[in-house]
Amino acid sequence: MSKRTAFVMGASQGIGKAIALKLADQHFSLVINSRNLDNIESVKEDILAKHPEASVIVLAGDMSDQHTRAGIFQKIESQCGRLDVLINNIPGGAPDTFDNCNIEDMTATFTQKTVAYIDAIKRASSLMKQNEFGRIINIVGNLWKEPGANMFTNSMMNAALINASKNISIQLAPHNITVNCLNPGFIATDRYHQFVENVMKKNSISKQKAEEQIASGIPMKRVGSAEETAALAAFLASEEASYITGQQISADGGSMKSI
């Protein structure tokens, strides 16, 4: 059997980088993406330093842009000839509320993440069908089920992604292609550290107090690591996860209270 090929978006930092490193440990051929060429080249160097024999292709570009997306998938097909795993990992839009949201920003967020994920799945699945195998993992978030008052648009778009993913999973299941959503909670990434700063400013408290306040709302009393999230993604990308599809799985230390 040929080595599996995985395409990881947003792989220059945080969860995306951790997933790329984890899949490299498991001997996947990798296509890694980020908007910043220098940053993603640095990740390639990290992978090759640990796995000199690894196959790593860098394709820089903004995956929220339709034309960039089309070009990158064309390159994956021409340079790899196959695609087995897709990690959809694009950040959402800026915080907003129902009172201050506007149509322009809502439309931009919908295009930036929701439409981009669905289009990427459409393009990736056409390649996966050639080998009757595929693993599609959408990085979403718990806001889809427990909306945040200050994340009005993102909460709504995440719910749309969960719904679309469930629908798509039914269509692709006969082709042995699974589609699942991975929903991180508070994970120690740059985005989390920005959130800590916002809590500090809002409450006029120290960084330590802000982090303690956040951790107090998590049953495990700590934030997660990108590596813990990557371990779950790697399992969903594996042969062992062959009967898991159409699911929404949280890596959040028990934060989500709904069932």
From Swiss-Prot:
EC number(s) stated in the UniProt entry for this protein: 1.3.1.-
GO biological process, one term: antibiotic biosynthetic process
Record keywords: Antibiotic biosynthesis, Cytoplasm, NADP, Oxidoreductase
SUPFAM superfamilies named in the record: NAD(P)-binding Rossmann-fold domains (SSF51735)
Pathway(s) of this molecule: Antibiotic biosynthesis; bacilysin biosynthesis
GO molecular function, one term: NADP binding
Role, per record: Along with the bacABCDEF operon, BacG is involved in the biosynthesis of the nonribosomally synthesized dipeptide antibiotic bacilysin, composed of L-alanine and L-anticapsin. Bacilysin is an irreversible inactivator of the glutaminase domain of glucosamine synthetase. BacG catalyzes the stereoselective reduction of exocyclic-delta(3),delta(5)-dihydro-hydroxyphenylpyruvate (ex-H2HPP), adding a pro-S hydride equivalent to C4 position to yield tetrahydro-hydroxyphenylpyruvate (H4HPP).
Protein name: NADPH-dependent reductase BacG
Source organism: Bacillus subtilis (strain 168)
Lineage per the UniProt record: Bacteria, Bacillati, Bacillota, Bacilli, Bacillales
